């Protein structure tokens, strides 16, 4: 399965944010999307998931144009989204939050989804009856990812999963995403920790002012002097 964009342009009101963006992610690969605040990364993810309409260009699921499809319809196709800020229901338990991610599953697959989430994040199993609002920041991020995985997505969009986390927890979350990829899921990762992102990703795109300015193998970009100077302070 391939999720791609061709010549994508969009924005808010009269303010254009994305300018002719081309990008793709396939099942079984982790692709990092890098850039400073305001580069357009979150806007791109919101457009991919159907929360924002493109002005021009196309969002493609294989060769199918997703124009006009709602976020719910895209989720049914297999497109998952872990938004920035987690957006959990704090007065619901871990298990209840996870169950919300299974809304589009065929009957009988919910338990399979729980098993998958709890295997990936054993800490969630230990706290399954605990209110989400009482979890630590790292545990809440694990829950947000687990909820998205309950729908068995083919492609998963993940926005700033390590935001506000201690370095050890940030690494734990990104390594968990790498295990998700090993199961065959494609992940498009927006992440502030550029060095760690490039270590776990196979490919990467770099955005500036709403445009893709660099792309390629993550290992090569990690050694690119422009990336090292702009994002790694080297």
Q: Where are the model-predicted features located?
A:
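Conserved ABC transporter NBD signature motif
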Residues: 57-65, 77, 110-114
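ABC-type ATPase nucleotide-binding domains, specifically the catalytic core motifs of the NBD
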Residues: 13, 69, 94-112, 120-125, ...
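Helix-to-loop junction immediately C-terminal to a conserved catalytic motif
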Residues: 49
């Amino acid at each position: 399965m391939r999720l791609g964009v061709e010549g994508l342009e969009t924005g808010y009101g009269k303010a254009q944010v994305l300018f002719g963006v081309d990008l793709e992610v396939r099942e079984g690969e982790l692709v990092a999307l890098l850039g400073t605040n305001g580069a357009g990364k979150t806007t791109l993810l919101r457009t991919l998931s159907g929360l924002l309409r493109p002005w021009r260009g196309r969002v493609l699921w294989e060769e199918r144009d997703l124009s006009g499809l709602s976020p719910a319809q895209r989720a049914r196709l297999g497109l998952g989204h872990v938004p920035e800020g987690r957006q959990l229901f704090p007065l619901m338990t871990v298990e209840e939050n996870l169950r919300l991610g299974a809304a589009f599953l065929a009957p009988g697959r919910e338990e399979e989804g729980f098993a998958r989430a709890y295997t990936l994040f054993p800490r969630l199993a230990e706290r399954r009856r605990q209110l989400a609002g009482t979890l630590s920041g790292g545990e809440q991020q694990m829950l947000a990812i687990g909820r998205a995985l309950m729908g068995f997505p083919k492609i998963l969009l993940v926005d700033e999963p390590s935001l506000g986390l201690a370095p050890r927890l940030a690494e734990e979350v990104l390594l968990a995403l790498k295990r998700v990829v090993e199961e065959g899921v494609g992940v498009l990762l927006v992440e502030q920790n550029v060095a760690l992102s490039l270590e776990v990703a196979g490919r990467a795109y770099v955005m500036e002012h709403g445009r893709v300015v660099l792309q390629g193998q993550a290992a090569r970009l990690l050694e690119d002097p422009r990336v090292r100077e702009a994002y790694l302070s080297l």
